[in-house]
Amino acid sequence: MDFTSSKSVSLFETSLLKENQFQQPQQQPSSPIKPIKPILKLVVNSNKKYNNKNISNNNNNNNNNNNNVCGNINNNNELGDQSDIERSFLINNFEGSDQLTNPYYNSIDIESIIIEVYSNQFSKLNCDFQGLISSKSKILNSNNFSSDYNYNNYNNNNNNNNNNNNNNNNNNNNNNNNNNNNNNKNNNKNNNNKPNNFIHHHHHHHHYHHYHNHHKVENLIDSHIFIGLMAFLILFILMVIGLLIYKYNLKKRVLILLEKRYQRKKKVKTSQFGDDFTSAKFSQVFPKNLNINQKNKDDGDDSSGADDLSVGGESFDGESDFEHFKEVQVVGDIDNVFFFKNNNYYYEENFDNENLINKEF
């Protein structure tokens, strides 16, 4: 057995049968089966194309190669593009190619086969050996091919429940690759028609990857569009907020709301109160319940020499009412309420209720 394409085999080459080692089928198909001598060769694709012409084939009928490959093939005895196919089956060195497509393999005594499945996308290979591969690096033997296993055509997709799926009606020696259970000719080089058992896995895998890649690209485009739209929306919202802040000075308004009225800066015109008021000296701490009508009775005769403070037409002595004098500045007024800043305190003087109130900043 000379496999000239051994370089393309990345996993192993093995013989599944020894000559003259057969087991009589426990369940016979409708048509008699002659003993066959297939050799199963597992090819794990490594992004290459495999050519059936390079594989030794002792079958005199070379036109049947396309019917015996679990893969996407064309009429030039050449596998199609397998860049996205991870594995495929090649069946060669056999007698009676029409027997290979028969779904009953109870007549074959399989010694053992070790198969490493690189992808868990497919738990079973949809070829005639369907059910053989179920997990990674698992040893399978002839016990997997018992009479209890349903070896009917698993790839019948014609939705005809009354159709016999044993592929007994397929003309597998036809060069036109009648790969459908309905005996329709497949003249498409890419085998777009529904394939039979032996090419179904490769076709299904190939179709799956094209479908998967197609939708993967669509999903990628959709995700990029979605991300772009969301980014644009966020930038637009930020721009609107920035314009509102710039136009309406929302920061200042928010500060005023948070700190009530005490952060509003408005210059008090000195002409309203006179120079004495703006240059007056106030104590660090005002008496909380100081009434502005409270007057100093010593008629300005104070030993400290401090000038009487005149506010709102009333006058009172600074020393008798205040212990320490420090300069404070008028920082603003709102609705006749005046604020005097001294250290960390705001002093509110309301001429309507005539009370001086201590406010902590």
Curated annotation (Swiss-Prot):
Subcellular localization(s) per the UniProt record: Membrane
Comp. bias intervals (Basic residues): 199-211
Compositional bias segments (type: Low complexity): 150-198
Key words of the record: Membrane, Transmembrane, Transmembrane helix
Name of the protein: Uncharacterized transmembrane protein DDB_G0285607
Transmembrane segments annotated in the record for this chain: 225-245
A cellular component term, taken from the record's GO annotations: membrane
Domain of life: Eukaryota
Membrane-topology annotation of the record: Single-pass membrane protein
Region annotation (Disordered) ranges: 53-75, 150-211
